[in-house]
Regions:
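Long, position-biased, composition-driven segments near the start of the mature protein
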Residues: 1-511
Length: 511
C-alpha cells in the first residue's frame, strides 16, 4: 500500500477484446505493467510457490515446497537452510522494489549479526539463523542496509522504470509477447488476428492490483492465454499433456565421465509392468539437488529449457527481451533478465547443474565501531561518534571509547556452520536416507513412510519390484525439467518411453 495515502497502488492496462471469439487479442500499457511482467523472470521458484499459496500447479514444485515445510530442521545443516529454501532472496530485489505494484515481500536488505557483543567476528548474514564463526547463532537484527547508490528511478529522478526505459507505450499479446507500440505492429496484429474492422474490437481498461498480478503470474505459468483467462476469469487450460517432450538435449555431447554423476544412485520401487514409479530411496545429496530448484529464478529455467520450461508462455516474455522489445530495456537490466542470478550463497544442487551463477557476497562499510553497530544497528550507530555535554562533569563525554570508529563487514554463507570454507549443502550429509515419491514429495526413510506410499498406490506385493538406477547428467537435466511440467516426474524420466511425451504448444510471435 502507498505509505502516503494508505491506498494499494494499481496499474491501468487497456485490453482489446474480440467479443465474438471471447479472447483478448492484445493489451496496451506503459512501462509499469511491462516492468511487472519482466519482474516475473527474476522470481525464485520457491517464492512463486509461496505467492501462489502452495497451489501453483506447476509440476512438482508444490510438493517440493511442502516437503521443505514438513521436514524437521534437524535434517538441515542449520536452521537457516530451511528458511533460505522457503523464502529465497531475489537477486534482482533492488529492481523489483521499484515496481509500481510489488508482489514479493521477501526481506532482502536485512542484516543479522552475532548477538554476543564480545564476539569480534566482523561478519553479517542476510538470513536469520545463520551461524557465526564463533559458533553462536546470528539473531541480532541490525536493520536494513541502505541501498548504495540510491536508485534514480526510485527517487523519481528519471522517467525510466525498474527494467524498461520510460516515455513509450508497449503492446503485450495474450501470450505475453512484448514490443513497443508502432503503426507497423498494429497493422501486423490486425492481419494476424484477421480483424478487418478495428471498430469491432472492444476496449476495456483493467486495473491490476497485487492480487490480480499474482493471478496473472499463476496463469502465465499454466496457460498460453493468461490475459484472456484473467479478463474472463476462466479456469486455466489443462488440455496440455502432462508429460515431457522428446529428449531435451540431443545436441549435448558430454564425455562418459561427465555422464556419470557422483552419488546419483537411486534405489527405485516401481511396478513390474513399468507403469509407475512409487518412490526412490535416496541420500541427502539427491534431496539437495531437488530442493535447489526452489532458489532458481524463473528466467534461468526458461533460459535453460526454452519452450519446454513450462506449460505457460513465459518463454515468449523471455524471448521478447532480446527480440521484439530489444532496445527498450535499461542497459544495465538487459543481462540481468536474460541471465538471472542467485542471491549470494543460495546456489547448490539444481543451480549448479543448470549453471546459474551467484551474485558476489556483499560488503558493508560501517561508520562506527563494531560494538556500537551491534547494539544500536543502522538507526543509531552514529552515536559511536557523539560526545554530548555532561553537566555533572562540565565537559563533553564520549559515549563510546573504542579507538576504531569504522568497521568493514563481510557477508558469510548462512549454510556454513562456524564459518567453514567448503561449499555448503542445505541438507545434512550423512547416513540419513530419504524417499522421494513420483511427484517429488520428500520424506525421511522409515518403514511407516514406505508402507504408506504403497498402501496409497493400492498395489499388491506381487506387482512391485525394486531396481537400482544410476542417473546420468542428461537424465538429471530431464528430471529437473520434468519437475516443472508433470506430477509424475520420476515415472516420466526413469520408465521406458512408451508413454506419449508430446506437449502441445500454441504461441504467437510478434514478428
Amino acid at each position: 500500500m502507498s505509505m502516503a495515502t494508505g491506498v494499494e497502488p494499481t496499474i491501468d492496462v487497456k485490453v482489446f477484446v474480440d467479443k465474438e471469439r471471447g479472447k483478448v487479442l492484445f493489451a496496451e500499457s506503459g512501462k509499469e505493467f511491462v516492468d511487472v511482467l519482466f519482474g516475473f523472470l527474476t522470481l525464485p521458484l520457491g517464492t512463486v510457490v509461496r505467492l501462489l499459496g502452495g497451489q501453483s500447479q506447476v509440476g512438482c514444485l508444490d510438493e517440493l515446497y511442502r516437503s521443505v515445510e514438513g521436514l524437521s530442521t534437524d535434517l538441515f545443516r542449520i536452521e537457516a537452510c530451511k528458511a533460505m529454501l522457503l523464502r529465497p532472496i531475489n537477486a534482482a530485489a533492488k529492481q523489483c522494489c521499484q515496481l509500481t505494484v510489488r508482489v514479493d515481500d521477501t526481506k532482502h536488505r536485512e542484516v543479522y549479526v552475532c548477538a554476543d557483543t564480545s564476539c569480534s567476528v566482523t561478519a553479517f548474514s542476510s538470513v536469520t539463523g545463520a551461524v557465526c564463526n564463533c559458533g553462536r547463532i546470528m539473531t541480532q537484527l541490525a536493520g536494513e542496509r541502505p541501498e548504495n547508490p540510491p536508485n534514480a528511478a526510485a527517487s523519481g529522478a528519471c522517467e525510466d522504470g525498474a527494467f524498461v526505459k520510460g516515455g513509450m507505450k508497449f503492446i503485450v499479446t495474450d501470450d505475453l509477447n512484448v514490443a513497443p507500440a508502432s503503426t507497423s505492429l498494429m497493422l501486423s496484429l490486425l492481419d494476424k488476428f484477421q480483424v478487418p474492422d478495428p471498430s469491432c474490437l472492444e476496449q476495456m481498461t483493467l486495473q491490476f492490483s497485487s492480487v490480480k498480478i499474482i493471478d496473472l503470474l499463476r496463469r502465465s505459468l499454466t496457460s498460453q492465454n493468461p490475459l484472456t483467462g484473467h479478463y474472463l476469469d476462466v479456469a486455466p487450460d489443462d488440455s496440455v499433456v502432462d508429460m515431457l517432450p522428446e529428449y531435451l538435449h540431443p545436441e549435448e555431447q558430454d564425455n562418459e565421465a561427465e555422464h556419470s554423476l557422483v552419488n546419483a544412485s537411486l534405489r527405485v520401487l516401481q511396478t513390474k509392468n513399468n507403469s509407475k514409479v512409487l518412490y526412490a530411496e535416496v541420500g541427502g545429496d539427491f534431496v539437495d539437488l531437488l530442493f535447489g530448484l526452489l532458489t532458481i529464478p524463473l528466467g534461468s529455467i526458461v533460459k535453460t529449457y526454452g519452450k519446454s520450461a513450462s506449460k505457460g508462455c513465459l518463454d515468449n516474455l523471455y524471448t521478447s527481451i532480446a527480440g521484439s522489445a530489444h532496445g527498450c530495456l535499461r542497459p544495465e537490466c538487459q543481462n540481468l533478465l536474460l541471465s538471472p542470478m542467485l542471491a549470494p550463497y543460495f546456489g547448490y544442487g539444481a543451480s549448479k547443474m543448470l549453471q546459474v551463477e551467484e551474485l558476489a557476497p556483499d560488503k558493508l562499510d560501517i561508520n562506527a565501531c563494531f560494538k556500537c553497530f551491534k547494539s544500536r544497528g543502522f538507526a543509531n550507530h552514529y552515536l559511536c561518534h557523539v560526545e554530548p555535554w555532561c553537566n555533572y562533569q562540565k565537559r563533553y563525554v564520549k559515549i563510546c571509547y573504542e579507538k576504531g570508529k569504522t568497521t568493514k563487514l563481510c557477508e558469510l554463507d548462512p549454510k556454513t556452520p562456524e564459518g567453514g570454507c567448503e561449499e555448503a549443502a542445505y541438507v545434512k550429509q550423512g547416513p540419513q536416507k530419504f524417499i522421494v515419491t513420483d511427484d517429488l514429495h520428500v520424506l525421511p526413510l522409515s518403514l511407516a513412510s514406505t508402507l504408506q506410499v504403497v498402501i496409497e498406490a493400492k498395489l499388491q506385493r506381487k506387482d512391485l519390484v525394486e531396481k537400482e538406477v544410476a542417473l546420468t547428467k542428461p537424465q538429471v537435466m530431464e528430471l529437473l525439467r520434468a519437475a516443472l511440467v508433470t506430477h509424475r516426474a520420476l515415472s516420466t524420466v526413469l520408465l521406458p518411453a512408451k508413454i506419449n511425451k508430446k506437449l502441445h504448444y500454441h504461441s504467437f510471435c510478434l514478428y
